[in-house]
Amino acid sequence: PLSGAIMFSKWIAHSYYSEDMDIVGIIESFGGLSLSEGEAKAYEAPYPSGEYKAGPHVWPYLIPTQLSENEKYWVDVYENWEKPFLVAFGENERITIGMKDDFLERIPNPTVITLKGASHFVQEEVGPELAKIIDDFIKNNP
């Protein structure tokens, strides 16, 4: 499998150069998912043609890729956080896993969980399990 950095670079290039972005391909590649025909159609439904995909074309540009871009928020908000904080990553995450250490090192006492069998799109892969974890976390941290 490709590393997260390589996949991210390919996604940026694809979003910049493609005229009709492959939404299903992105979901399957980044999430490690194999969508059924029905699921694939559901992901494509909001975008009947490439001209409707302006939003997805800018998705990669909305992600801060350098810590310096949001350093002020890390210091002002996260490093001074005094409330419960839940961090969840899929055990097979390849895209954002590099951020895990930032959360562990910079947020005081985060609760960090690893979602077994999940990759990047945890809400798709283990949605009910994730919902229960979030619900329990909220109930146990009023």
Q: Predicted segment positions?
A:
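Conserved serine/cysteine hydrolase catalytic core
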Residues: 51-105
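Generic structural signal for small/hydrophobic residues in well-ordered secondary structure
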Residues: 43, 56, 87-90, 103, ...
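Helix-loop "lid/cap" segments that line or gate small-molecule binding pockets
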Residues: 23-35, 42-48, 60-66
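Catalytic active-site module of serine/aspartate enzymes centered on a nucleophile-bearing elbow/loop
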Residues: 110-142
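Flexible "cap/lid" loop of the alpha/beta hydrolase fold
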Residues: 1-19, 23
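Ligand-binding pocket scaffold of soluble enzyme catalytic domains
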Residues: 17, 46-48, 98
